[in-house]
């Protein structure tokens, strides 16, 4: 009976998690449109529902009823699987995110001892959805876009992983809960500020967020690796990109802003609420970046990843190792 109850709880958590993430991404998209419109002196979505709040639902309905056209030269199986692989890899990161302290109903779905490694592994697997999507469509623009996305993800993932090594050294653990609990007195943003900058920039590049949205550069590649995708399959790729952007805010909150730990001694506010407030703060930073920075040139993007970000991450790791060895 206990085994079946455990399985039932996990299934319920998985369904609730998927619904919550999808809802969060829809809200993220709505506010992004409003924010971008405000910066461009426009009004944004206003037609669907009061103040345009139902616009994401209208977008989903529109994509669901669009005709699903597959190119004749495409590989049918891989063409259909690629967006699903990409989306579930983006969604899988949330399985080990500690939303609240251990024992809470809304705590993480899984609590592996090597949670950081699980996140890096799932993030690395997301490359397959992008690469296969561009290759399966047998379109030159899609193939070039997928090659760009794959090279970009692999390049910046090294810097992202190395920036987390400093956090792991200071915490002495690769468990997500241990990393969050170690920030009760002081968040990692201050001792690991260099690591935070590297991680945040690399996570934006992983997500293909501005100014790193080179894989779908409209002036060069039409729409990149999802040029030949339409309907809900295009919607899944679009949802994947937005989920990656939200993942960037969530992981930055967990690793560097203390996760569910309260700030300023305000312990009367639940940890789950603190977590959401910090994520919202990082999300608005994402909006601000998207409104402010132009797109990089592709060669400068790669040079920045290998010759700037990776050495800075290595320098941060060496400095952290010396500090831990001498004073910690």
Swiss-Prot record:
Record's bilayer topology term: Multi-pass membrane protein
Listed transmembrane segments: 11-31, 81-101, 116-136, 154-174, 189-209, 235-257, 269-289, 308-328
Reaction(s) the record says it catalyses: a quinone + NADH + 5 H(+)(in) = a quinol + NAD(+) + 4 H(+)(out)
Gene Ontology CC terms: plasma membrane
EC number(s) given by UniProt: 7.1.1.-
Main localization category: membrane
A Pfam family reported for this protein in Swiss-Prot or TrEMBL: NADHdh
Key words of the record: Cell membrane, Membrane, NAD, Quinone, Translocase, Transmembrane, Transmembrane helix, Ubiquinone
Top EC class for this record: translocase
Compartment(s) where it occurs, according to its Swiss-Prot or TrEMBL record: Cell membrane
GO term, biological process aspect, one: aerobic respiration
PANTHER family: NADH DEHYDROGENASE SUBUNIT 1 (PTHR11432), NADH-UBIQUINONE OXIDOREDUCTASE CHAIN 1 (PTHR11432:SF3)
Name of this chain's protein: NADH-quinone oxidoreductase subunit H 1
Species of the source: Symbiobacterium thermophilum (strain DSM 24528 / JCM 14929 / IAM 14863 / T)
């Amino acid at each position: 009976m206990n085994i079946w109850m455990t399985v039932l709880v996990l299934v319920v958590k998985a369904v609730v998690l998927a619904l919550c993430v999808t809802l969060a991404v829809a809200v993220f998209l709505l506010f992004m449109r409003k924010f971008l419109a405000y910066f461009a002196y426009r009004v944004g979505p206003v037609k669907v529902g009061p103040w345009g709040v139902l616009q994401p639902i209208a977008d989903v309905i529109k994509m669901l009823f669009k005709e699903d056209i597959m190119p004749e030269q495409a590989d049918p199986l891989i063409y259909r699987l690629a967006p699903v692989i990409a989306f579930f890899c983006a969604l899988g990161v949330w399985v080990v995110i500690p939303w609240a302290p251990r024992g809470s109903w809304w705590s993480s779905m899984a609590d592996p001892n090597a949670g950081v490694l699980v996140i890096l592994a799932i993030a690395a697997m997301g490359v397959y959805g992008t690469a296969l999507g561009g290759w399966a469509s047998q379109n030159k623009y899609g193939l070039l876009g997928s090659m760009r996305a794959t090279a970009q993800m692999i390049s910046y993932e090294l810097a992202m992983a190395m920036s987390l090594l400093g956090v792991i050294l200071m915490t002495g653990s690769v468990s997500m809960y241990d990393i969050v609990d170690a920030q009760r007195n002081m968040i990692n943003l201050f001792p690991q500020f260099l690591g935070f900058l590297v991680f945040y920039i690399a996570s934006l590049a992983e997500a293909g967020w501005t100014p790193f949205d080179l894989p779908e550069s409209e002036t060069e590649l039409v729409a990149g690796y999802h040029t030949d995708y339409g309907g809900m399959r295009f919607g899944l790729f679009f949802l994947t990109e937005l989920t990656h952007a939200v993942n960037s805010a969530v992981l930055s909150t967990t690793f560097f802003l203390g996760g569910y730990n309260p700030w300023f001694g305000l312990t009367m506010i639940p940890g789950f609420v603190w977590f959401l407030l910090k994520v919202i703060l990082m999300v608005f930073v994402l909006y601000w970046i998207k409104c402010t920075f132009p797109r990089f040139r592709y060669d400068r993007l790669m040079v920045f990843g290998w010759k700037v970000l990776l050495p800075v991450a290595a320098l941060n790791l060496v400095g952290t190792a010396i500090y831990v060895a001498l004073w910690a």
